[in-house]
Every structure is written in structure tokens, then in C-alpha cells.
Amino acid sequence: MLEQLKEEVFQANLELPERGLIKYTWGNVSAVDREKGLFVIKPSGVGYDDMQASDMVVCDFEGNVIEGDLNPSSDMPTHAVLYKEFPEIGAVVHTHSTWATIWAQAGLDVPAMGTTHADTFYGTVPCARFLTQAEIDRGYEEETGLAIVETFRERGIKPMEVPGVLLHGHGPFPWAKDAK
């Protein structure tokens, strides 16, 4: 099921360590098949050197595993919320890249500082608010997605004009039209 999408997601995940964007297994890429209402995501805790395309996990937007022998990334509920609420996006990435994670700890938006920034982000990159203890207790990963959606809706930001966000105290969640 979704073999081509699994391969694309697998290859995109392999780029994370190659580009120095992750430590250990702390990062993931997913991509969606809108016609089927399913997405493919990296499995949880699997080393990038040990991973194969067949290890990718197929999930629905409700967070159910549809296919796969491994557990999906612990960030899967965040990805599911983003796919449900932002139908224009086709792939989501989450890393703990050093500089973006450091910036996210401050809880500050990333201001547009020049044309290079504007090549990808048409405005300030927002930092979604810190989650409350009640939200964390309800389910950190799903609440993360909801806080991101809240940030974009409250600020009137279009997800494909500003294709990413920081989460206060956590790190970056960028997205794109596909995983390539």
C-alpha cells in the first residue's frame, strides 16, 4: 500500500541526518495521499542507518495505523492534525535542528530579515505558544498540532505562504507540497 509514497518518505527521512538536522532518531518526515486520506510517516525510534522504505508506517487522519509492523513516530498525531486542518500541505517535517530548536526555546517569532528568507517564507515565521499543563496531559503531540493551527488561524497566515512554524519550547515543524 502506498509503496511509492513510502519510498519518497523514506528518502526524505534519510536526508535529515545527512543535512545535520537531527540527533539520534529525533526527527521525522511524513507525506500524504489526499485521495486515499492516508499519510506515511517514519517509524518511532528506528535508526536512520537501519531503516528501510518498507518500515514506513501508513496512518489515517484520526491517528490509526493502517499498515506497518512498527509504531509510527511519536509526533504522528501532530502530523495528522496538520493534514486534517491544512488540506493544501502534502508533507510535514519535524526536527530538533540545533538553531531552530534554540530559537524555539525563546518563544519568539523569526522575523523576515531579507530576501533569502522571503524566497521561502512570505513573512515572519511564527512561534506557536507554549502548551499548558492541561494540554500536555491531554496529549502533547495532538495538542501541538492544534496549537500550530490556532496560531495560523488567529494570525490569518496561509500555510503555504509561511510553510512552517516553531513550537515554543520544542522546535520546528516545516511543511511543503510534497516530500521531495
Walk through the language-model features, giving the residues of each.
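Glycine-rich flexible loops
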Residues: 1-180
